[in-house]
Amino acid sequence: MTAPPPASGLGRGLPLALPAAYLAHLAEEILSGPGFVAWMNARLAPGFTLERFVAINLVVWPLALGLCTAAALRPRFTALAVPVAAALFVNGLLHAAASLAFGAYSPGTATGILLYLPLGATVLHRASRTLAPRPFALGLASGLAAHAAVALAAFAS
């Protein structure tokens, strides 16, 4: 008897690793030193509040979980993991770049480098080989736009 094929072009586990990594990243942002909110206030966004941080993530994380769950369960929804992977990959790059630019650890950098970059790159690479160019490009653009929208929400005063 053979095992059933993966439900997604990415397999079942890989898409679901993205929202799991997101939770680990949130834990790092909240629990590291004074936390990401304080880091942002001191360097980039003086009006950034814990309430805004929580509100943003209470919207974004369930959305990421839903998209990645659909991608894990149905091959025709593989493209739904692409925006999540793209946004997390960019977030990992930005945490690393911010730490270097400001000469100070940005809470979230460790999980950004250790989880977001390899997971994001793996999902994007596999999706680029599984999907037609148009759905892949749309997913990539959607992820970049979503990350930009989150950044704008964080910087809004």
Spell out what each predicted region is.
Residues S8-E29:
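N-terminal signal-anchor transmembrane alpha helix
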